[in-house]
Amino acid sequence: MQKATYYDSSAIFGGYTYQGANGFNYNASQQQYPPSSHVESDYHRPACSLQSPGTVPHHKPNDINESCMRTSASQPSHHPVIAEQQQQKQPPPPPPPPPPSVSPPQNTSSNSTQSSTSKNPTLTSQATISKQIFPWMKESRQNAKQKTSSSSSVESSAGEKSPPGPASKRARTAYTSAQLVELEKEFHFNRYLCRPRRVEMANLLNLTERQIKIWFQNRRMKYKKDQKAKGMLTSSGGQSPCRSPIPPSAAGGYANSMHSLATSAPYDPHSPTSFSKPHQNAYAIPTSYPGPLNSCPPPQKRYAGTAAVTPEYDTHPLQGNGGYGTPHLQGSPVYVGGNFVESMPSSGPSLFSLTHLGHPPSGNMDYNGAGPMTSNHHHGPCDPHPTYTDLSSHHPSQGRIQEAPKLTHL
């Protein structure tokens, strides 16, 4: 296809009467020497292919073909130099090497072909020079890229502390044990360094100020995390006993430490115990079990419950069936179902510190057990000879403190 284009170009320029240095013009040469034109078009294909219309778009095709014909016609030396300068201004991709063997009609060609062959080594040398320069320049850029990528990969393998980016390529600082000891000692005395001390430590430890500042920032964050973890541990450890239900012995100790209680006699383990105390020491223990009012005078107190009241009973809203005794009697806290509760005097409109329990208008308080209390239980005033063992007739003025007896059935 290239041959056809160059034949066409030679036919196009056949009409021009362009005279070379040796006196030959193109009109006669095209007719007299067809083999020479064939050889010229074959031989100068690399020089013309260097400046094809595709690679050099700002040149007209006529100018390119004219430059090719000028080189083939062995003009004076300034014309090929201009073409070669144009070649160097726009370096194309490296051309294919020229054919090593030339066809035999070259020997019978005119002086123009001989001069073109003598001119050809300069063209090939220029092509090889451009071929050496342009890939060498390109290769140097690639080498620079490879060097930067290899250096960045080495730094990343060494371990980067900063996030990856083109601007930050600072490697992770490795502190020696002596430096760490000095830094920890300084942090123990002062968590925030002033600048003079930081400069002094930087000179002492052979570090930069920035490294010391960043180490102190990280150490403060670690200290804050440790303190937060310790605080959570202590708070969870301190709250766990409070959330757990109070055992009977602990509840008894709490009641005895708050108020001096009288001695309680041994009893059947299924029945709760009653502790006598003065009226002015009445208080509401934060439990949800109201105690009934006792209708006995203090020397003849009875137990406020029966064996039917089990420790697992649940408190219900107050009801009006079978209220206890007469007003203006002393209230006493009652140990019912593993917790101490207290009975309030019925003389005034006092309430428990409980949100879901109200005070009945009659002034009498009642509670319901796990099963309703049957009618055969004795709810009237105590007789002078109680069924259960009486409490000690001595009041808390004796100062004796008695713990609640341990229940064996729980």
Curated annotation (Swiss-Prot):
List the CDD domains hit by this protein, alphabetically.
homeodomain
Q: What is the lineage of its organism?
A: Eukaryota, Metazoa, Chordata, Craniata, Vertebrata
Q: Where is this region: Disordered?
A: 29-126, 139-173, 368-410
Q: Name one GO biological process term.
A: embryonic skeletal system morphogenesis
Give the residue ranges of motif Antp-type hexapeptide.
Answer: 133-138
The gene that this protein is the product of is: HOXA3
A GO MF term: DNA-binding transcription factor activity, RNA polymerase II-specific
**In which compartments does the protein localize?**
Nucleus
Per its record, how is this protein called by name? Homeobox protein Hox-A3
Q: Which stretches hold the DNA-binding feature? A: 168-227
Role: Sequence-specific transcription factor which is part of a developmental regulatory system that provides cells with specific positional identities on the anterior-posterior axis.
Which domain of life does the protein's organism represent? Eukaryota
Q: What segments bear the compositional bias annotation Pro residues?
A: 90-103
By its UniProt entry, which SUPFAM superfamilies does this protein fall under? Answer: Homeodomain-like
Q: Where do Low complexity bias regions lie?
A: 104-122
The record, for InterPro entries, names: DUF4074, HD, HD_metazoa, Homeobox_Antennapedia_CS, Homeobox_CS, Homeodomain-like_sf
Q: Which organism is it from?
A: Heterodontus francisci (Horn shark)
Composition bias type Polar residues, residue spans? 64-77, 389-400
Please give the GO cellular component terms listed in this UniProt entry. Answer: nucleus
Which keywords label this protein? Developmental protein, DNA-binding, Homeobox, Nucleus, Transcription, Transcription regulation
Similarity remark: Belongs to the Antp homeobox family.
